[in-house]
Design a protein with these regions (language model features):
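An anion/pyrophosphate-binding glycine-rich loop and adjacent beta-alpha core
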Residues: 1-39, 150-154, 159-282
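A glycine-rich dinucleotide-binding beta-alpha-beta segment and adjacent secondary-structure elements
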Residues: 86, 93, 282-380
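Short acidic/His/Gly/Ser-rich catalytic and metal-binding motifs that mark active-site loops
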Residues: 122-127, 246-249, 379-382
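C-terminal structured subdomain/cap of oxidoreductase catalytic cores
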Residues: 106-111, 254-256, 342-416
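Glycine-rich loop(s) and the adjacent beta-strand/alpha-helix scaffold that form part
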Residues: 54-61, 73, 101-178, 224, ...
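Internal hydrophobic alpha-helix adjacent to the cofactor/substrate pocket in enzyme cavities
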Residues: 150-159, 276-279, 284-287, 393-416
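Conserved redox-cofactor binding core of oxidoreductases
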Residues: 1-103, 125, 173-174, 294-327
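Short Gly/Pro-enriched turn/cap motifs at secondary-structure boundaries
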Residues: 142, 186-191, 213, 227, ...
Length: 423
């Protein structure tokens, strides 16, 4: 990912968001060439400081700034503080929209169509419970992500589609907030697969490959038929003194004590189990087995550390023989309860689209003049290839396809792939 100097955005510099979740002043190469996420002490903080001072952005914020600059360079108007209230439909075709700004109605005519790209609905508690089956809706995303696409496109007759959503795990550090006082939730993804760390259920048992999020998140939805309860939730991340001294945990730096309200600490595993209500014998047996795997470098239960993704994203290249395996051995021990969250912007439920990213109506025909892109579109394009960055990739792809079709030059790339792969 290239670096974007956000000072070129002019008045839009402060209006273009940065992320509270990633070190956006470093590229992936900067991070992984210096020991990865697990070795913050090796990062080039001089470069980081210079880029922060110059507001040079990398990763997702850099990509966002790049697109904003593209809009500026093309003299395309942008408006903040403007809420789209409804689409204007004429004889089944979307021809414009009605918005409000400062309490006044604004009507915009669409010459070639309207594109809805307002992300998902994770900050809408009602939608998250009904559509994503979230028990206690929490999310990492910004507070404004409330599902406007479902309302707008739904009123125009668009279908809503879904496949089962994936739950994420996360935690909240008291005092960390987003705008409007909304609690800032952090994903546990970068920390679960670190050495000297495991994730266990109430029986004290591991239930997944902690270094690969798909393994963990699908394990969360397993039901115990005898008790009619979740087998692996609630769950806790367990670490020892080595893990706490070596690695960060959200905004808590290596070696720092957890703030009040974050986790518990105990001199022994038995004491830790008692404090969090986990089966002590189960936890002791799990840790003993796991520590044995750390000696051989082979996790015989869940193959942790065998996937390049896990080794790269939450592994420590200094840890031998397996970058994701380090024993949970040294006192004191720590436990932090992990909470279910929506998919970090990657919800499955959304507006059904066709190969040109047109919204599809309940008659299974495209709604002319209405396009949907990114997380506003139903995520039915799922599979093993879907890894980190998929939301950005989908948004870019949808925008390209919608733009080509609206311009009267529809792309045939998807149909070529369908033919090539005999789908």
């Amino acid at each position: 990912m290239s670096i974007r100097d956000s000072r070129t955005l002019g008045e839009w510099q402060d209006k273009t968001r940065v992320s509270p979740h990633i070190p956006y002043s470093l590229t992936h190469e900067d991070i992984f060439d210096n020991g990865g996420m697990a070795n913050m002490a090796n990062w080039d903080f001089t470069v980081m400081g210079e880029r922060l001072a110059n507001d040079e952005r990398c990763a997702g914020p850099g990509l966002a700034a790049y697109f904003v600059k593209g809009v500026i360079d093309r003299d395309i108007p942008m408006h903040v503080g403007t809420c789209v209230e409804e689409l204007v439909v004429d004889d089944g075709t979307v021809v414009g929209l009605r918005a409000t700004r400062d309490g006044e109605d604004i009507y915009v005519k669409a010459n070639r169509g309207v594109v809805i790209a307002v992300s998902s609905f994770e900050r809408n508690v009602d939608y998250s419970r009904k559509l994503a089956l979230q028990i206690e809706p929490r999310s990492m995303v910004m507070p404004s992500i409330k599902g406007a696409h479902l309302r707008l496109a739904g009123e125009a007759g668009a279908q809503i589609a879904r496949v089962p959503d994936v739950s994420m795990l996360g935690f909240h550090i008291p005092g960390e907030e987003q705008e409007e006082g909304v609690p800032l939730w952090r994903g546990a993804l970068p920390f679960m697969g670190l050495p000297h760390t495991i994730v266990v259920n109430h029986r004290g048992k591991r239930f997944a490959n902690e270094a690969f999020y798909r393994s963990v998140y699908f394990g969360l939805d397993e039901i115990d038929g005898m008790t009619q309860s979740y087998k692996n939730f609630p769950c806790w991340i367990i670490m020892d003194r080595q893990g706490r001294e070596k690695y960060p945990f959200g905004s808590v730096m290596p070696g720092d004590d957890f703030p009040d309200g974050v986790g518990v600490k105990a001199a022994t595993l038995a004491e830790l189990a008692a404090k969090i209500g986990v089966d002590a014998h189960g936890l002791a047996a799990t840790v003993d087995t796991f520590n044995g795997y750390c000696e051989t470098g082979e996790d015989r239960d869940f193959q942790r550390g065998t996937y390049p993704w896990g080794a790269m994203m939450c592994g420590d290249p200094k840890q031998k023989p397996n970058p994701n395996l380090g024993p949970v051995l040294k006192s004191p021990f720590y436990a932090v309860e992990l909470h279910r969250m929506a998919g970090g912007g990657i919800t499955s439920t959304g507006i059904l689209i066709d190969e040109h990213c047109r919204a599809v109506g309940w008659d299974d025909k495209p709604i002319e003049g209405l396009y949907v892109a990114g997380n506003s579109a139903a995520r039915l394009d799922n599979g093993a290839l879907m890894q980190s960055g998929i939301t950005n990739a989908r948004g870019i792809t949808h925008g390209y396809l919608a733009g080509r079709h609206a311009a009267g030059k529809p792309s045939g790339l998807l149909q070529q792939e369908v033919t090539r792969q005999s789908l």
